[in-house]
């Protein structure tokens, strides 16, 4: 009897270890399943808010920015002036219609540029930016980068390109606390996003790298130069027709 009790005690640790191992093995599968369901849900559901908006709100609250307010209103892609999507593609990701989430040529160019000691340049595609802004937190850790790649693969797999672009122009930050085309059009020019002009659209695209530093409503010299360049690029790409599904 005493021996049986000793055997039971010796058996418990291996059983606990096996249970722990099962959880360790199951956790990645559970996360993968949950993330797939997330992405599938947002293929048809328009999110009322994104992680980047939550992050900015918490930042403002933590720093005591009493006057901060968040502006966002969803608009379907067909309710936004066609000049805006082509402007952001011309500015941010000209291979968007043809790549599968990652622009390897742009990544190589950015790596060479950064290796020469220039100001650090990114090579994130629109798909990667959607993954980051909708599902993840801000940061540069390898964990976040890995999750960004995973979500990028999922949205490219499960969402049509038009949905990715629609999500992008609705969650992108165009000014401090101003997210999406509709909020930007209202705050800057007092109009609906459907009435944005090509110049206004190009201005919004021009401030995307640093929307808290540059002002689309009162553009300085840099934004004006960038706006003109974006308009030229958009014309060279073929205008809004460049983004039409084949």
UniProtKB/Swiss-Prot annotation:
Membrane topology recorded in Swiss-Prot or TrEMBL: Single-pass membrane protein
GO biological process, one term: peptidoglycan biosynthetic process
Keyword terms, alphabetized: Cell inner membrane, Cell membrane, Cell shape, Cell wall biogenesis/degradation, Glycosyltransferase, Membrane, Peptidoglycan synthesis, Transferase, Transmembrane, Transmembrane helix
Coiled coil, from the record: none
Cross-referenced Pfam families: Transgly (PF00912)
Compartments reported by the entry: Cell inner membrane
Annotated TM spans: 20-42
Catalytic activity, as annotated: [GlcNAc-(1->4)-Mur2Ac(oyl-L-Ala-gamma-D-Glu-L-Lys-D-Ala-D-Ala)](n)-di-trans,octa-cis-undecaprenyl diphosphate + beta-D-GlcNAc-(1->4)-Mur2Ac(oyl-L-Ala-gamma-D-Glu-L-Lys-D-Ala-D-Ala)-di-trans,octa-cis-undecaprenyl diphosphate = [GlcNAc-(1->4)-Mur2Ac(oyl-L-Ala-gamma-D-Glu-L-Lys-D-Ala-D-Ala)](n+1)-di-trans,octa-cis-undecaprenyl diphosphate + di-trans,octa-cis-undecaprenyl diphosphate + H(+)
Molecular-function GO term, any one: pentosyltransferase activity
Pathway: Cell wall biogenesis; peptidoglycan biosynthesis
Record keyword Transmembrane helix present: yes
GO annotation, cellular component aspect: peptidoglycan-based cell wall; plasma membrane
Matches recorded under SUPFAM superfamilies: Lysozyme-like (SSF53955)
EC numbers, comma separated: 2.4.99.28
General function of this protein: Peptidoglycan polymerase that catalyzes glycan chain elongation from lipid-linked precursors.
Protein family per UniProt: Belongs to the glycosyltransferase 51 family.
Protein name: Biosynthetic peptidoglycan transglycosylase
Organism per entry: Xanthomonas campestris pv. campestris (strain ATCC 33913 / DSM 3586 / NCPPB 528 / LMG 568 / P 25)
Organism lineage: Bacteria, Pseudomonadati, Pseudomonadota, Gammaproteobacteria, Lysobacterales
